[in-house]
From Swiss-Prot:
Family affiliation: Belongs to the RRF family.
Record GO terms (molecular function): ribosomal large subunit binding
Name of the protein this chain belongs to: Ribosome-recycling factor
Species for this entry: Nocardioides sp. (strain ATCC BAA-499 / JS614)
Gene3D superfamilies given in the database record: 3.30.1360.40, Ribosome-recycling factor (1.10.132.20)
Keywords: Cytoplasm, Protein biosynthesis
UniProt signal peptide: none
GO-annotated cellular components: cytoplasm
Length: 185
C-alpha cells in the first residue's frame, strides 16, 4: 500500500516537473524555438486547433521562424492567432509560408522573462508540494485505519519528503539553467 502511494506520487511529481520544463521551453531565450508556439490555438473551420497540427516549423536563423501551413486556407486564421498571442511578433506571409522575425532581446525583456521563469518554477514547486500533501494524507489515512504502524508511516513520510526534495531540486536546476540562458548575450 505504502509503495503504491509513493509510486503514484513520484509519477505525478515527474509529470509536474515535465510540465514545468515545457513551460520553460516556451520562454524565449537567445534563439527562437518552435515550442514557443505550443500554446497557440487557431480557429480552424470553427474548431479550436493547436497550431502544431496545422503547420510545420523551421528556424533558418536564430531570430526567424518560418511556418508552413498544411492547408493554405488556414493562413489567415494562423496569422490572426499569432498576432493575438503574447509572443510580441508581427507575422508576415508571402502566400505560402508565414515568416515571424523576433526582435533582439533587450535587457528589460530578458529581466521580464526571468521573472516569468521564476513564476513558472514556483508554480511547479507548488504543484509538487500539493502532490506531497495529498500523498501524506493518504498515508495518514492508512495509519488511522490501522493498516500500517507508526514506524512504517514515519519511514514512508521520510521517503515522500525525499521524493519532494528530488523534484523541487530538479525544478530549481531547470530554473538556474533558464536564467543563465536568458542572461547570455
Amino acid at each position: 500500500m505504502i509503495n503504491d502511494i509513493l509510486n503514484e506520487a513520484d509519477g505525478k511529481m515527474d509529470k509536474s516537473v515535465e510540465a514545468t520544463r515545457e513551460e520553460f521551453a516556451a520562454i524565449r531565450a537567445g534563439r527562437v524555438n518552435p515550442s514557443m508556439f505550443n500554446k497557440i490555438v487557431v480557429d480552424y473551420y470553427g474548431s479550436p486547433t493547436p497550431l502544431q497540427q496545422l503547420a510545420s516549423f523551421t528556424a533558418p536563423e536564430a531570430r526567424i521562424i518560418l511556418i508552413a501551413p498544411y492547408d493554405q486556407g488556414a493562413m489567415h486564421n494562423i496569422l490572426k492567432a499569432i498576432r493575438d498571442s503574447d509572443l510580441g511578433v508581427n507575422p508576415a506571409d508571402d502566400g505560402k509560408v508565414i515568416r515571424c522575425v523576433f526582435p533582439e532581446l533587450t535587457e528589460e525583456r530578458r529581466k521580464e522573462y526571468i521573472k516569468i521563469s521564476r513564476h513558472k518554477a514556483e508554480e511547479g514547486r507548488v504543484a509538487v508540494r500539493n502532490l506531497r500533501r495529498t500523498a501524506k494524507q493518504h498515508l495518514e489515512r492508512l495509519e488511522k485505519d490501522g493498516e500500517v504502524g507508526q514506524d512504517d508511516l514515519t519511514g514512508a513520510e521520510k521517503r515522500l519528503d525525499g521524493l519532494t526534495k528530488k523534484h523541487t531540486d530538479a525544478i530549481d536546476e531547470m530554473l538556474k539553467h533558464k536564467e543563465a540562458e536568458l542572461l547570455e548575450v
